Amino acid sequence: LMEAADRVDSTAGVQMAYMKRWAPRALKPLELRLPALLPGEGRATRADAVEIAAEVEADLVYLDPPYNQHSYLGNYHVWESLTLWDKPETYGVANKRVDVKTRKSAFNSRPGIGPALEAVIERVKTPNLIVSFNDEGYLARAELERMLSARGPVRVIEIAHPRYVGARIGIHNPKGEKVGTVGRLRN
């Protein structure tokens, strides 16, 4: 259902905001498809990463934590509602869940991200840990490397990537008037 919803959304990549005009794909019918599954055991978990990290034991762990004030709950609130099937009270043009305002993660605050990520890095049981992180995040690269080096050798692979859409189009006020300037275009 989540994949089907993703194929017909009208967003610029995340669900925190929507396009001013309907995207052509949003007018297509919702089509459920059986996803391609890899053979073998698998597990899906909906939990706080800090709380569940000690239970994770794997050959390889990939972490993609939030890196600024934008929560994954706010960015992907439609998927949260689909998985919970709870029909929550919503607000705004994007119809975000009201609990987006109160369900905050330590990863979404400057003082909280360091201790939270360090706890996950320390607790997860894996010989191979991959961490994806943005250079505009609350956590400095040197601090992230320090945390990771406590586990062993660290190899950094930098990948230039286009910045999020808002950075490419500039900052606009609620009336739609451009009030900011476009910054650098790549991370």
Stretches found by the model and what they are:
Residues L1-Y76, K87-R103:
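SAM-dependent nucleic-acid methyltransferase catalytic core
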Residues T45, I130, R155-I157:
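Hydrophobic/aromatic beta-strand patches that form the interior of the parallel beta-sheet core
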Residues D59, N75-V78, L144-R146, I171:
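Short, glycine/charged-enriched secondary-structure capping and boundary segments
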Residues S71-E80, G112-L117:
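A short, conserved alpha-helix within the catalytic core of class I
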Residues T83-K87, I169:
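Long, charge-dense
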Residues D86-A94, P127-N134:
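Conserved beta-strand signature within the Rossmann-like core of class I S-adenosyl-L-methionine
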Residues S105-G152:
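Conserved Class I SAM-dependent methyltransferase catalytic core
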Residues L139-N187:
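C-terminal catalytic and target-recognition region of SAM-dependent MTase-like enzymes
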